[in-house]
Amino acid sequence: ACSKQLGEKCKCNKQCCGATVVCGTIWVGGKEVNKCMSKTSNNWFLNKLGEGMNAVANAFSISCN
């Protein structure tokens, strides 16, 4: 079952609650941070980034127990 909401740190997609919410990687101050984020956003740049990340995430699906 999902346990994380948008903006919370996560390890894999299924932890994040919501049909369009994925566990994505962002960079904060040079450090990699995994957070639950929406696949779609109002920002076209983030959308393009998200599309690429989803393709990568789907290819190397992160699994967690």
From Swiss-Prot:
One of its GO terms (molecular function) is toxin activity. Expressed by the venom gland. GO terms for cellular component: extracellular region. Disulfide bonds: none annotated. Transmembrane segments: none annotated. Signal peptide: none annotated. Keywords: Disulfide bond, Neurotoxin, Secreted, Toxin. Contains 4 disulfide bonds. It is found in: Secreted. Belongs to the neurotoxin 25 family. F7 subfamily. In vivo, intrathorax injection into crickets causes death. This is U15-hexatoxin-Mg1b. It comes from Macrothele gigas (Japanese funnel web spider).
